[in-house]
Amino acid sequence: MLLAVSKTFPPGHIEAAYAAGQRAFGENHAQEGVEKITVLAALALERRVAQGRQENSRTRSDAIIPSAGVASPERPLLLPLEWHFIGPIQSNKTRLIAEHFQWVHSLDREKIAQRLNAARPDGTPPLNVCIQVNVSGEAAKSGVTPGEEAKLADVIARLPRLKLRGLMAIPEPTTDVTLQRRRFALLRELKDRLAARGHALDTLSMGMSDDLEAAIMEGATMVRVGSAIFGPRTK
């Protein structure tokens, strides 16, 4: 699965990607992501209403009443998009994330898991989550240390409003393909160990623009690509 990382890009870029067939989008910052989710949801509603009005008018007569809100190839209907949160999670942003996103890739603390579970609204599907693992051992990088994912997975399994889907990693950048593959292979092995403990996992979120080939060779089910889709970031 291709996850289009839309951080820093405006809603218009997401519309264009949607028109080209993309449905899943990733955001790193809760506030920025929620603003886009809200804007695009309102736009989708406006276009659905306009589309319905146009269809009703066609039923009553042969006349077609043009409307700026009606969907077209250039103005897609914007059916529900799938939103993934992929950045570091601040405690004070857990409610925003739990209320607006369908996926979280960067869960690495029991406290955050509990807060997301508590904030997930009643009547909504469980929040899909991946545990982030620090496969490179970088001191400044988020993620649990390899071997600690099992404890967090057991905690998540007891939280009814979260659904553990798999593991995520953002390895330290390197051009050494052998090293890239070794780090991604480690994540796959950790996922297999969790499966042996009874966790039904189906997701390996790993690989970005510069290392996605190595990630795919090691079993990635979801790759995160931004600038290759949207162009260079300006901020």
Regions found by a protein language model. Name each.
Residues 221-222:
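Divalent-metal-activated hydrolytic enzyme cores
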Residues 1-48, 52-58, 64-65, 69, ...:
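Conserved alpha/beta-domain cores
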Residues 235:
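Active-site loop ensemble at the mouth of alpha/beta enzyme cores that anchors a bound cofactor
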